[in-house]
Design a protein with these regions (language model features):
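Short, low-complexity N-terminal intrinsically disordered segments enriched in polar/charged residues
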Residues: 1-30, 46
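Intrinsic-disorder-associated interaction segments
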Residues: 6, 10, 14, 29, ...
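Short amphipathic alpha-helical segments that mediate assembly, nucleic-acid/protein binding
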Residues: 18-21, 33, 45, 64, ...
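Short, well-ordered alpha-helical segments enriched in acidic and aromatic residues
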Residues: 32-50, 54
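Surface-exposed, charged secondary-structure patches
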Residues: 53-115
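Short beta-strand edge/turn micro-motifs at domain boundaries
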Residues: 102-147
Length: 147
């Protein structure tokens, strides 16, 4: 669990951040793997592809679609208690590297908090900088799901 002292800034959650966190839970449990892939931040996509290449090197039967599906299944297992949509925090927490965390509270007898990582990605559209929020499933030690 992430502690508040690990964050550089805590602010009120914006509508865009709230929607990104809710959308992540919704997309995570859909069957469409391409939709899951499309919400991941570029850093995580690169990490996944690098891990895939290393695994494929040692086992040529490993294929990318199945590899990504296995990762999604592992992430689904972590967030499974949120399928019925938990309550979303009113705050967003920023790391010193710019990654954001939105907390979702699970339901049940012993509810726990599930952090959803958001990464701002900047791109140029019609000669103007724009930003979109993408999901980050890895923590700073990129080998572990962000819990």
């Amino acid at each position: 669990m992430l502690k508040n002292e690990e964050f550089a800034l805590t602010k009120e959650l914006t509508k865009e951040q709230q929607e990104a966190a809710r959308n992540f839970i919704q997309v995570l449990f859909q069957e469409d793997l391409s939709e899951f892939w499309s919400i991941l931040c570029d850093i995580d996509k690169s990490r996944i592809y690098g891990l895939y290449e290393a695994n494929h090197y040692y086992d040529s039967d490993v294929e990318l679609h199945g590899f990504v599906q296995e990762i999604r299944d592992n992430v689904r297992a972590v967030y499974a208690p949120l399928q019925g949509q938990g309550g979303i925090s009113t705050k967003v927490r920023y790391t010193s590297e710019g990654k954001m965390y939105v907390y979702i509270l699970g339901s049940g007898e012993n509810p726990r908090v599930y952090p959803v990582g958001l990464m701002p990605e900047t791109y140029i559209e019609e000669e103007r900088f724009s930003q979109r929020l993408q999901i980050s499933i890895y923590n700073d030690e990129f080998r572990n799901v962000a819990l």
